[in-house]
């Protein structure tokens, strides 16, 4: 299933940048960066549980925000891409890690 993950991490405290890096790393473990704070992750239900738990353990609910969008398996009908950055089809395009 395709998950769209967005986040906003506060830099008002000294740990903000470290949280930002950890959140991005967790997302990169399962997907690709679509924009600075937006990731597209193709995960199984079990992987989603692990990823979501990692993200919820990392962010600070008092000053950060996370959003999870369940796009499911028929996501191609729900996503349109326009603009300069090329779109990555995580099911078709080759990713080199």
Q: Where do the PLM segments sit?
A:
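Intrinsically disordered, low-complexity boundary segments flanking structured domains
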Residues: 25-27, 52-57, 80-84
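Short, intrinsically disordered low-complexity segments
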Residues: 35-72
């Amino acid at each position: 299933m395709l998950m769209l993950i967005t986040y906003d991490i506060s830099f008002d405290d000294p740990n903000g940048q470290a949280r930002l890096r950890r959140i991005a790393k967790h997302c990169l473990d399962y997907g690709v960066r679509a924009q600075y704070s937006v990731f597209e992750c193709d995960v199984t239900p079990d992987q989603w549980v692990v990823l979501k738990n990692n993200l919820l353990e990392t962010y600070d609910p008092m000053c950060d925000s996370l959003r999870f969008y369940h796009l499911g398996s028929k996501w191609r009908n729900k996503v349109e891409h326009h603009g300069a950055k090329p779109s990555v089809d995580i099911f078709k395009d080759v990713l080199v890690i």
